[in-house]
Amino acid sequence: YSSAASDVYKRQVSEHTMCVEKDENKMAFLIREHILALLGDHMVSIEEALLESFYILLELYKNQPITPELVEEYFSPETLLQLRTAITQAKSTISSLETWEECNELLQDLAVNYRKEGLYEKFLTPVITQAEYYSQIFGRQGIHVGEDMDATKGENEAGQLWDRWRQFRNAFASYELLLRNFLRNEVFSDLILPENFEMEPEEADNLEHMVLQMQWIAIAYAVIRQSLFLKWSLDADGIPAEEALDYETVREYMVVISRMTGYEDEDIRGYLENSFAELIWDWGYFALII
């Protein structure tokens, strides 16, 4: 990912004392508090809040041992402002349709076992059929969405998809408050190891758990957005884009995807290990799916 984003933290890390206060319990809750605050800040988009949170978690994970003072510095307004600028520049190099393409694959991968068992058919069958349709179109035409989109606007399936995706994102944005509340609930419920409430686990275990849970939350968010786009694309013909994405549909797909991603911690780790080249992603991949 962007070296500019990486440079933001060099000063903090170089000044970091090794006289670490061993209060991992306190720091886990402190980190969660800051991430909840980011997701609750309506001046920061949902995507920006997720990207910033994951970047900081990665930095904390890489620079153990950490102190509460270092955590506070990472989440300070000055540092966040610098990070936001760097992330905006880095994110601008990723095509939104590359994001679409990757999320289309994530949705299909996540749904495989549920479809085999005949679960959630009412919700999954239409959107997975649509997802597979797009995958076949791009494969048959040799179109890679991210690379070829600009050259094909309005001229073929890929160009039509680009137009639809932009329309959908406008409709999707009207449910920002609902999505923020969902993500804040996921962070509050899942970001901290249950052991924190009974004992103090090792700092490394805490931070790794936080990173993995943030990856899992990102998958859930990306798959909710993708499934809603595919459902919307089936329903939007002949009616205004906003009307085709109603509250009940959004809520229903959020509930279904939440159930589909409601894994135990060990199962989440297993899924990530089996589905990705590295257990812990680099920031660039997180940015790709967000």
Regions found by a protein language model. Name each.
Residues 1-5, 9-12:
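Single conserved hydrophobic/aromatic residue that forms the stacking wall/gate
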Residues 10-41, 52-59:
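Intrinsically disordered, low-complexity regulatory regions of eukaryotic transcription factors
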Residues 42-290:
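Hydrophobic, aromatic-lined core segments that form the binding pocket/scaffold
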